[in-house]
Amino acid sequence: MKKSINEIADFLGGKVVGDGGILIKAVRGIDEAGPGDITFVANPQYEKKLNETGASAVLVTRDTERPGENVTLIQVDDPYVSLGKLLTIFYPEEREKPGISAQAIVEEGAEISPSATVYPGVYISSGAGIGAGVVLYPGVFVGRDAVIGENSILYPNVCVYRRCLIGKRVILHAGAVVGSDGFGFANPGRDNIKIPQIGIVQIDDDVEIGANTTIDRATLGRTWIQRGVKIDNLVQIAHNVVIGEKSIIVSQVGISGSTRLGRSVILGGQAGLVGHLQIGDFAMVGAQSGVHEDVPANSVVSGSPCQPHRNWLRSMSCLPRLPDMRHLLNDLRKRIETLEKLSEMKKEVEKEKESSREKEETK
């Protein structure tokens, strides 16, 4: 497929600065792009590469100026969003052929839409419901009475346990596990007694969950991933957690039981949250933060234990200077000790002088 820069700009609602007649055949990164390619610059720190790229066209912000005659710009509101739209044109998704493979196992009582695609090695349990346009790749397991909503995609080796509910247009990447038992144990004395986990996981529409992420079923009730949430790879979500609409959870985050996230919360990579917390709407938690208390709405916290982000920045700015500060402190301590000794010696001398005067006066 080839499209002119003018055609691309019209599609994106952008403005061409340069030669709009050049034909574009591919979309590539700014370092790899060559003649006939289009790339993008969404981060200001990469604007210097506009002079270096071999691309024929670059998606840029509205206020970016053309660096020279060698590259044509398409000015848009958001280059990254425009890139996403452009990729759907140059690299459209292939439509899966509907049907159930003879090598899939479907128990009696399962309901599967005729427009669903079920690959070899899929296991669908009794009472499960598979909606229209769903794609189940090899190795997927769908438990008893689980529901997979319309146009959802479950990549290889995804496991959806019994009675869990998956909404429409949900994407579960390879190895994701939905509905494994919550980590619920009572330990009277030194015994660990398992508490049955009889709740479910509910995943609402338009959620995407990364590879090898695990979401535990609730002890009672539901673990709930609300509409539009995006979860990265290797995330652990414990029993009865609620993640509010359009929140973003980055890789290796761990969320303990019964913690509730509000709307549009962002958790940075490797953040850890203890249980039974309330994280307010639009809050942001920095990478590797240890969250031990509630986080108010619209706040930004970082560090372990977490604290307001600005306080954490001030603390971190001191760390590189700690060795020098330690040497300075030791030097000051020695000076103070020396001054104290001199002061004591001075006092002794004064005492001796005073004693000598008294003796002279008594004579």
Curated annotation (Swiss-Prot):
MF-aspect GO terms: N-acyltransferase activity
GO BP term, pick one: lipid A biosynthetic process
HAMAP family in UniProt: LpxD
Region (Disordered): 342-363
GO cellular component terms, semicolon-separated: membrane
One Pfam assignment: LpxD
Functional description taken from the UniProt entry: Catalyzes the N-acylation of UDP-3-O-acylglucosamine using 3-hydroxyacyl-ACP as the acyl donor. Is involved in the biosynthesis of lipid A, a phosphorylated glycolipid that anchors the lipopolysaccharide to the outer membrane of the cell.
Quaternary state and interactors: Homotrimer.
Enzyme Commission numbers on file: 2.3.1.191
Pathway: Bacterial outer membrane biogenesis; LPS lipid A biosynthesis
Upper classification of the organism: Bacteria, Pseudomonadati, Thermodesulfobacteriota, Syntrophia, Syntrophales
Top-rank taxon, per record: Bacteria
UniProt-recorded name of the protein: UDP-3-O-acylglucosamine N-acyltransferase
PANTHER family in alphabetical order: UDP-3-O-ACYLGLUCOSAMINE N-ACYLTRANSFERASE, UDP-3-O-ACYLGLUCOSAMINE N-ACYLTRANSFERASE 1, MITOCHONDRIAL-RELATED
Enzyme class: transferase
Positions annotated as active site in the UniProt record: H239 (proton acceptor)
Catalytically driven reaction(s): a UDP-3-O-[(3R)-3-hydroxyacyl]-alpha-D-glucosamine + a (3R)-hydroxyacyl-[ACP] = a UDP-2-N,3-O-bis[(3R)-3-hydroxyacyl]-alpha-D-glucosamine + holo-[ACP] + H(+)
